[in-house]
Amino acid sequence: MDDSLFYNMFESRMEQDLLKICRNHGMLENHLLQSDDINDKWNSYAPEYMAQSVKEIADYPTVAIAWAAYIGMAVACWWNRDWDKLKDQPYSVLQGERGFDDMDEHIVRDILGLQLEGAEAKKIENVIHSCAEHALGLIRREGIEPQSKKAFYVYARTEQVMFKIGAAIELHRL
């Protein structure tokens, strides 16, 4: 199987698996809600996000994978709120006081406007954690050599799916 076919199949399988997890948690229905505007924003954030998250993957793999979903939620929130005004937000706006480390809390509290200890925030945290754990399991089952070109591309596809999942969750919440 050629690499691009492998990556496409991996991404499709992951998207379907994560959609099922979100459905089981009552966070999505039968398809991913999407917008080209939102999906395109990943392309501008991905280089900075990937540069930060790759450093965390060895010690905090679920965090490194999960935070892309929170970015998707933030972008979907902006898209709904006032896209013309908010579409050019720099990546740095997504980071909390501790940078990458508290990005999730910053997005939930300061962008989505939820109380961190509230039921909705906890539900979001649980589903994103479940998705990230499942994604990590899928990556590991592939038996790809760590730090290889193939590992990077699989990781990049994983992050893109997580971003889409987060965006879909937020669009569904609205």
Would you name each region that the model predicts?
Residues M1-L174:
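Intrinsic-disorder/low-complexity detector
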